[in-house]
Curated annotation (Swiss-Prot):
Protein name: Phosphonates import ATP-binding protein PhnC 2
Taxonomic classification: Bacteria, Bacillati, Cyanobacteriota, Cyanophyceae, Nostocales
Gene: phnC2
Keyword vocabulary terms for this entry: ATP-binding, Cell inner membrane, Cell membrane, Membrane, Nucleotide-binding, Phosphonate transport, Translocase, Transport
Family classification: Belongs to the ABC transporter superfamily. Phosphonates importer (TC 3.A.1.9.1) family.
SMART domains: AAA
Length: 244
């Protein structure tokens, strides 16, 4: 059995005329269970596209993604999306809903319309409250998310991703637009999930210092290709060398 929970084999997306290349071009990489991996690169390098391809949100013209040794296809995609939580850039919360209601939205994919017609089951609500408490948001559970700070909103988004009990968490620029304190809160939350629960975390980041502090391994992309894969030591030098 493979040691890898994620395997990408020669991923390629459609050719983009404005770029004169595919967004992803022959991408191959492997990620082990329990790793904290950061994706780095300039704007347009393909970081977010690679992340989204891991849950079938990007059409590929070539290559395969394997999750837990199984090739991704339309038949098993629902199961993969239960095993892989996704934290979108900006959180993707519904501002008119409360924190707990946004967290419960993470259960929509596993509940039928009939099950949610009269509200979510009590066990779902208890789990949502438990997750918010773990993230220091219990007292804000019934507050509209539009009233929360950026860091609080991002932690609500993390709780929403966690309510499906994923094995893997993907975070697309989770600190974008946050101040220093909120950024630290969000990254500490991801680090705790990784360290205490053994969760596999893959995050797209721009700050090399934050990447070096929290991640175990870095993958640097340039023009749709992987140009570096390895330790987070001396990332500044690696980034400069590989983006010249």
């Amino acid at each position: 059995m493979s040691d890898y929970v994620i395997e990408c084999h020669n991923l390629e997306t459609a050719y983009v005329g404005s770029l004169n290349r595919p967004i992803l071009n022959e991408i191959s990489c492997h990620i082990k269970q329990g790793e904290f991996v950061v994706l780095l690169g300039l704007n347009g390098a393909g970081k977010s596209t690679l992340l989204r391809s891991l849950v079938g949100l990007v059409p590929l013209v070539r290559g395969e993604v394997h999750i837990n040794g199984v090739a991704m296809n339309s038949r098993i995609l629902p199961q993969i999306r239960r095993d892989v939580g996704m934290l979108f850039q900006g959180g993707g919360l519904i501002p008119q809903l409360s924190a707990i209601e946004n967290v419960l939205c993470g259960r929509l994919g596993t509940r039928t319309t009939w099950q949610t017609l009269f509200g979510f089951p009590k066990r779902d609500r208890l789990l949502a409250l438990e997750l918010l408490e773990q993230l220091g948001l219990r007292e804000l559970a019934y507050q509209k998310t539009s009233k929360l700070s950026g860091g609080q909103q991002q932690r609500v988004a993390i709780a929403r991703a966690l309510i499906q009990s994923p094995q893997i968490l993907l975070a697309d620029e989770p600190t974008t637009g946050l101040d220093v304190i909120a950024t630290q809160q969000v990254m500490e939350t991801l680090a705790e999930l990784h360290a205490q629960q053994g969760m596999t975390v893959i995050a797209v980041l721009h700050d090399l210092g934050i990447a070096a502090r929290y991640a175990q391994r870095a993958i640097i992309l340039d023009a749709g290709r992987i140009v570096y894969e390895g330790s987070c030591d001396n990332l500044q030098a690696q980034f400069v060398v590989n983006n010249q």
